[in-house]
Every structure is written in C-alpha cells, then in structure tokens.
Amino acid sequence: MALVTTPTVNDGPLFAEVNMSSDFNAPTVRATVVQASTIFYDTPATLDKAERLLAEAASYGAQIVVFPEAFIGGYPRGSNFGVSIGNRTAKGKEDFRKYHSAAIDVPGPEVDRLAALAGKYKVYLVMGVIERDGYTLYCTVLFFGAQGRYLGKHRKLMPTALERIIWGFGDGSTIPVFETPIGKIGAAICWENKMPLLRTAMYAKGVEIYCAPTADSREVWQASMTHIALEGGCFVLSANQFCRRRDYPPPPEYVFEGTEENLTPDSVVCAGGSVIISPSGAVLAGPSYEGEALISADLDLGEIARAKFDFDVVGHYSRPEVLSLVVKDHPTNPVTFTSASTKIEDKTK
C-alpha cells in the first residue's frame, strides 16, 4: 500500500491518497475526509471555504466527502460562555448571541446551498453543522446525496461537559443510516462514539461507511476509531478540524479561558488527527497532525463481508435471547398540541 501526498496549488491543503489492491468482484469507493478550520463567526465565508475544499476533493475523484464536527457554525473551543455555577455573565450571553447568529436553520438557505454543491460535484456529502432550532442549538451532521438532494440529519445525542450549556440533546428520531449506491452511510459525533448502545443501533441499521466527525485530536482517539471499525465490520471515516489560535477572533472578542496568556497566533489549538480505517482495523490514510489536509482512501467494499465472516456483532455473533437493545426512535417534543374536532349536527333535519 503506497501513500502519496500531493501538494495543491497556492500551498493549500494536502491530499493524502491511498492506492489499495482491489477485489474486482466488489465495488471500490473513493472517500475523503476534510481536515480544516472553520472561519469563526463568518458562516458565508465558511461555506465558501467548504466549496473550495469540496471541489478539490471531487477533482481527485472523491465519491464521499466528510467534514469535521461543527464545521459550519464552529466549535467554540476554549470558551466558557461566562458560565459558573449560579452565575452567567453579560459577555457570555453576548457570546451566545453571536454563536446563535452563526448557526444555520435546517431546512434553510445554507442547507439548499450544500445540497446544490453535492449535486454540482457529484459527491455524497457529510457535513458537521451547528443547527439552530428557535433558540436551541444542536451539534448536527447533515447528509446529502450526489444528485443534489438533502437526505437527512443526525443530532448529537449527548454533548460533552460544557457543551451541554450551549447545545441541546438529540433524540432517537435522528439516528439515520442511508442506503446509497456507494454503501450504507451513517454518522456519530465525537464522544457519542464512545456510547456502545448508540453504536449497536447503527450496526443494527447496517452501517457500512461509519462517519465520525469529531473535535478530539488526542492520540487515544485513534484507538476508539480502530475499535469501532473492528466491532462494526465497517469503514470508519473520522474528520477533525486543524486550528491555530489565529483561526478564532482575537481577544477580547474571543478568549481561550485559562490558556489565552500562553497562546500565540500560531499556537495549534486543535491538531486534527483525521483518519480512515478499514473493517479489518488497518489504517488506510492518516492520521494527519501537520495542518489542513484532504485525506483520501479507496474503500474496497468487499472488506466488509470478509470482516463479518468472523464477527458480525448484530448478526451471527449476537445473542438476542440473552442481550438485546430497545431504541426509542420517535421524536420527543416538550409540548404536544392536540385538537378535538366537534361534529356539529344539523338539527333542522
């Protein structure tokens, strides 16, 4: 297996390409994960950047392109939104107002644009966004088909730590796996990948291309991705941002609480680590920690059946009479309105 990195024009991102030997009886899919930074508080500029990266990936033949967690809208790394137990600051509330303003409605014009881009470049697009639903924000993944159609979304079920201050909780109605000509595609976001029951639900839906947009650049993340590939007998595509301090607004507009005084504009605040892993646990491309990059591998879909010959976690290796899972896949709304229709009889009859 040869790893080839090809510089792009204008010193842009690198495209790490893996040429795999392929079984001629099984289809091969070229997958790309994007490792790049949001343009914080500037959603139109971030969408423009997404288009440039998508066009570049498509020029190399990518059929599915996965962007990082919260790429549209931004991951507010280092911010505490002025929160301490029993207290919220005026600046923190203003920070939330700006963050809310940078989020997108689903459906909405930004979703329409992303769908059009997927169709223009003929790729399946998996995009991390901050979704605005009224005044609640969700960390969400959007799915788009290569024909230019919005397919659906997954809302992060469990935000981690202080994320719970700014993001709502998804429910069981948005755990989709989409059957497409290039395989069954699903996604889990960042640390919800550590939730065994969520993974099991996705395996039960037959996920073959398991997308894992994340904000975790630690080396230990690689162990989680390898485990999921082996456990699920699926390809794992994990995309993370690569960010320096200069990719965020300068202080005092934006402050990395507790570390700002130690940072320079060139300080790396998120080191990437984007990776593509096969169902056998082999690393096909990445992890990359050196800067913005497009990371690609050719996925031999025959690897899925070969992996599941030994271990099919919700098939021949399951014991449903001993261990089983119930998933509540209906929406959970805080308010339900019901209307009773009253039949008015014509008393003249």
Swiss-Prot record:
UniProt-listed Gene3D superfamilies: Carbon-nitrogen hydrolase
Q: Which InterPro entries match?
A: C-N_Hydrolase, C-N_Hydrolase_sf, Nitrilase/CN_hydratase_CS, Nitrilases_CHs
Gene responsible for this protein: NIT4A
Q: Which PROSITE patterns match?
A: CN_HYDROLASE (PS50263), NITRIL_CHT_1 (PS00920), NITRIL_CHT_2 (PS00921)
Ordered alphabetically, the record's keywords are: Hydrolase, Lyase
Q: Which intervals hold domain CN hydrolase? A: 29-301
Q: What is this protein called?
A: Bifunctional nitrilase/nitrile hydratase NIT4A
| Source organism superkingdom | Eukaryota
The record lists the organism as: Lupinus angustifolius (Narrow-leaved blue lupine)
Q: Which reaction does it catalyse?
A: L-asparagine = 3-cyano-L-alanine + H2O; 3-cyano-L-alanine + 2 H2O = L-aspartate + NH4(+)
